[in-house]
């Protein structure tokens, strides 16, 4: 793994996606003591402290964030602006990575006062290390910045770089929303199996195994999948 292994990180927001990334980074060797998390919700702060001993969990913006070389924005879109304005003074000079949906990089640059910004659109399989993430970097993000971001998102699965920020909207529809369609079809297959006489556990195992196997087959082929 690259530079983030030795770069202090700050997470603004400590929900499921942040937890998945933090867990992946620690598993890859980043010392927990190099991670700060700002999380306003007290029960979630307690959960993070229990889950990740050594990680510094803060209630709000603090001068402690000034050590961060990379700030990961994992807040809800409606709270992003206020959080950014509160934290901007403590994160001057840092690289910023946002996993918040729908917040354009122009707005982020205005609130944070920097051009070193990368937007990411992950999906829910990232929670188990099998995600697919679309990435867009503003021109002010260097090759080194992009490499740091790649090292971080690699802990949650695969990624693709996009040339246009607007393509993140397409990524949201395709891979961001895609798992919901897979689960819907999976449920339909399971229910069909039960309807035809299989017990629920067997139908579930067959349906999931079919999806896993078909996905592996598609990934191993250079040809586009066809019915």
What do the predicted segments below correspond to?
Residues 1-60, 111, 131, 194-195:
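NAD(P)+-binding Rossmann beta1-loop-alpha1 motif at the extreme N-terminus of oxidoreductases
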Residues 9, 117, 167-173, 226-227:
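Short pre-catalytic strand/loop immediately N-terminal to key active-site residues, enriched for Gly-Thr
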Residues 20, 47, 82-83, 107, ...:
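Phosphate- and divalent-cation-binding pockets in alpha/beta enzyme and binding domains
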Residues 32-35, 93-94, 116, 201:
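Short acidic capping loops at alpha-helix termini that bridge into adjacent secondary structure
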Residues 42, 52, 61-135, 139:
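Rossmann-like NAD(P)(H) cofactor-binding subdomain of soluble oxidoreductases
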Residues 107-116, 132-170, 183-220:
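Internal alpha-helical scaffold of NAD(P)-dependent oxidoreductase catalytic cores
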Residues 178:
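Aromatic-residue-lined binding/catalytic grooves and analogous aromatic/hydrophobic interfacial grooves
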């Amino acid at each position: 793994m690259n530079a983030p292994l030795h770069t202090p990180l700050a997470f603004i927001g400590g929900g499921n996606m942040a937890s998945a990334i933090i867990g992946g980074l620690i598993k890859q060797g980043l010392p927990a003591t190099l991670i700060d998390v700002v999380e306003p919700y007290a029960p979630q702060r307690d959960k993070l402290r229990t889950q990740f001993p050594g990680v510094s969990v803060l209630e709000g913006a603090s001068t402690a964030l000034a050590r961060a070389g990379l700030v990961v924005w994992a807040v809800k879109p409606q709270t992003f602006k206020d959080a950014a304005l509160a934290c901007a003074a403590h994160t001057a000079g840092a690289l910023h990575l946002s996993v918040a949906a729908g917040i354009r990089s122009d707005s982020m640059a205005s609130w944070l006062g920097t051009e070193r910004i990368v937007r990411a659109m992950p999906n829910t399989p990232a929670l188990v290390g099998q995600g697919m993430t679309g990435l867009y970097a503003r021109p002010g993000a260097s090759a080194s910045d992009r490499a740091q971001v790649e090292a971080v998102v690699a802990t949650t699965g695969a990624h693709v770089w996009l040339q246009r920020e607007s393509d993140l909207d397409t990524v949201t529809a395709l891979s961001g929303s895609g798992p919901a369609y897979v689960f819907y079809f999976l449920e339909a297959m399971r229910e069909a199996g039960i309807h035809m006489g299989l017990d629920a556990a067997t139908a579930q195992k067959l349906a999931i195994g079919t999806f896993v196997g078909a996905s592996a087959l598609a990934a191993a082929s250079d040809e586009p999948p066809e019915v």
